[in-house]
Amino acid sequence: MSKTFNVNGICYPNEHYMVNIDSKLAQIKQLVDEKKYFVINRARQYGKTTTLNMLVKYLADKYTVFFISFEGLGETAFESETAFCGTICELLYDTVLYEEVPTIDDTVKQIIIDSIKKKAQDMLSLSSLISNICKNAEVPVILMIDEVDQASDHKVFIDFLGMLRSKFLKRSTRPTFQSVILAGVYDIKNLKHRIREDHEHQMNSPWNIAADFSVDMSFTRDDIASMLDEYEKDYKCTMEDCGIDL
């Protein structure tokens, strides 16, 4: 199948003409290697989801990567702690069911399969599940969550961040994720402000453990030119032939 240009949704290297983002992936991997928790917040059509999708494979030789998304979740997923924790279990299970985790050992796979039979009922049990996964994994575990804006108006999501923060602070003695990457349009601190009105809570965000994300997600002229070069080779033409001035 011939490749096409895609401006709607996720891009796949075998289907679409794409800018080479290896340098960006390498910079993000550096943050992961340093055990950073961080947020990628950029406007839509900035390639966040495509980048995360490619990051799964980029990290696979060294990490077990779970990539889930809150996109499409209804209000019932956030209406209670029990519902939210059960949803996280289901999202993790789906990544295993559809073989979306390139590097995962059988023990961890079975832990996640078992978790769907008896879903976590609260943050404490979800925390225990996370520790169990990370303790038994043969390589460090990464969690990536896309479309976190879907959870922006729900307190239970802030509680979830608080649980992850608690585990982050105790990670020298208790197994947890090597890195957590959240992606969305808005900064996670702004999401928190929309829920908590108390000044003390506003200044004490559960995500104040996050490192600054300074990777430039935009594309340079040279980046775009490399993508068009591939098109020229495929169609044996030049941009000038097409009336495009670079």
What are the functions of these language-model segments?
Residues M18-I21, D122-M123, M239:
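A conditional alpha-helix N-cap/helix-loop micro-motif detector
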Residues Q30, E34-Y46, T50-I158, Q178, ...:
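P-loop NTPase nucleotide-binding core
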Residues M1-K36, I188:
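A short, basic N-terminal segment
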Residues T4-I10, T103-K109, W207:
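Short, basic/glycine-rich phosphate-binding loops at helix/coil junctions
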Residues G9-I10, K155-L246:
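The catalytic "switch" region of P-loop NTPases
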Residues K24-I28, L126-I130, L164, L228, ...:
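Generic hydrophobic alpha-helical segments
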